[in-house]
Amino acid sequence: YIFSASFDSGDNSQWDSEQDTGTLLDFPSWRTLAAIPGAATPYRGGYCMRITPGDTNAHTVTEADLNIADTATAWLRFALFISNNFAATADDIFNIYEWQSTGPVVEACISLQITAATDIVDIGIADGTEVSSGFTQISKGVWHQIEALCTCDVAAGSDGILELYVDGIQVQRVTGFNFAAAITDGVLGTLNTLSTTNAGYHL
């Protein structure tokens, strides 16, 4: 594998950098979460990353050596928990993972969509800066295994491939695109949220 990390040190030390203007990201222990009614314990180990939405800033950790070269294929996997009280007062689409090239330039992403009228949450994958179609509903209050395949294509030919899996089931496949450059960074967290997405949390 290229990169593997956990949060069992209770911080971001296994990642290259953190962005958290507004201080909405932390690394709670199972003891902290156990005191919250309805909260999950960490998916694995004693700590996890938590983001409490409420502003438009990025709240992320970054691995700067992802290094998916032209024509190469790489997989990623992370666990995701969306609290039952996660809610918004306006419809919102925001990224929870980005594949970035030097710049940084967002080449592909995994996005969540929340609909204000129902607070239903959907997940999707796309070439480019934000998912606009192909969403699949994802349940709140339980852990999900999120997996994705990325085949990088920089040269002419539009041979790029993205696949998204939720709990082992493929929910989306995107083909026929090019990246501007090879992938260098992987960014996990929340990016481009609206301030109206302001209730609940993600783990």
Predicted regions and their residues:
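Solvent-exposed strand-to-loop "edge" motifs in beta-rich extracellular domains
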Residues: 9, 67-73, 79-87, 99, ...
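Extracellular glycan-recognition surfaces and repeat-rich motifs
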Residues: 11-51
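Secreted extracellular polysaccharide-interacting domains
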Residues: 48-77, 128-133
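Carbohydrate-binding surfaces in secreted/extracellular proteins
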Residues: 78, 145-176
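Beta-strand acidic-aromatic groove motif in beta-rich domains, primarily in extracellular
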Residues: 86-98, 157-161
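Glycan-recognition/cleft segments
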Residues: 92-124, 134
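Short, aromatic/His-centered strand-loop micro-motif at the edge of beta-sheets
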Residues: 123-145, 154
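Flexible glycan-contacting loops in extracellular carbohydrate-active proteins
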Residues: 174-202
